[in-house]
């Protein structure tokens, strides 16, 4: 049976989300480069792996998956006893699992849409020869500040967003934060003491640094 393959781009935050999970699990894998600038993700053979034309796609033997957060959850469960545990300390505890699931949903629907717009404006536009729209940055930073206020309150109660242990909830934030730390938006993280500590810890994990 073939090993693990990730079809994506190393600069993609969604691809990085999966790569960090694999590194946390100390799993061997092959990264199959998909060139986004050439539109390879919108053509065959990639579309046969993800009909929506978005990276990454994933294979583990005969299993084929797409959507990065679904992939990381598969990795966390399939390889639960290998490497870092990415699930709640008691993965059979329904309440703990539900809290982690809330965090995953909050990241996907409250944090990431705003943070990704800021990364696009301040990082990725430059790669395409486009100018940053400062009005958009100001608008999105105001939204992100509100999300981070919620995080600050949560992190005053717990070490991590889903409790006292590092889980997928925290991991899913890492790739876009890595980009935003190199922009003026960094101030939104550093001016909140607990958020700042949390960001420093999760971005300095060995698995996180391997995708830079």
Swiss-Prot record:
Binding-site list for glutathione: 12-13, 41-42, 54-55, 67-68
Gene Ontology cellular-component terms listed: cytoplasm; cytosol; mitochondrion
CDD domains, per database record: GST_C_Phi, GST_N_Phi
All residue ranges annotated as the GST N-terminal domain in the record: 2-83
Gene3D superfamilies named in the record: 1.20.1050.10, Glutaredoxin (3.40.30.10)
Superkingdom, natural source: Eukaryota
SUPFAM superfamilies: GST C-terminal domain-like (SSF47616), Thioredoxin-like (SSF52833)
Family according to the record: Belongs to the GST superfamily. Phi family.
Stated name of the protein: Glutathione S-transferase F3
Originating species: Arabidopsis thaliana (Mouse-ear cress)
Upper lineage: Eukaryota, Viridiplantae, Streptophyta, Embryophyta, Tracheophyta
Gene this chain is encoded by: GSTF3
């Amino acid at each position: 049976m073939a090993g693990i393959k990730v079809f994506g781009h190393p600069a993609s935050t969604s691809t990085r989300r999966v790569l960090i999970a694999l590194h946390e699990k100390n799993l061997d894998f092959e990264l199959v480069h998909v060139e986004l600038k050439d539109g390879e993700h919108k053509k065959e053979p990639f579309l046969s792996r993800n009909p929506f034309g978005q990276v990454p796609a994933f294979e583990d033997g005969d299993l084929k998956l797409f959507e990065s957060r679904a992939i990381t959850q598969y990795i966390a469960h399939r390889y639960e006893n290998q490497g870092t545990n990415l699930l709640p300390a008691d993965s059979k505890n329904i309440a703990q699992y539900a809290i982690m699931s809330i965090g995953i949903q909050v990241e996907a629907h409250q944090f990431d849409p705003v943070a990704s717009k800021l990364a696009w404006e301040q990082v990725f536009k430059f790669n395409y020869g486009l100018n940053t729209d400062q009005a958009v940055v100001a608008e999105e930073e105001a939204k992100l500040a509100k999300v981070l206020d919620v995080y600050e309150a949560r992190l005053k109660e717990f070490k991590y967003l889903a409790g006292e242990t590092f889980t997928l909830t925290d991991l899913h934030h890492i790739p876009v934060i890595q980009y935003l730390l190199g922009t003026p938006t960094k101030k939104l993280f550093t001016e909140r003491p607990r958020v700042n500590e949390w960001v420093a810890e999760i971005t300095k994990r060995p698995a996180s640094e391997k995708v830079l």
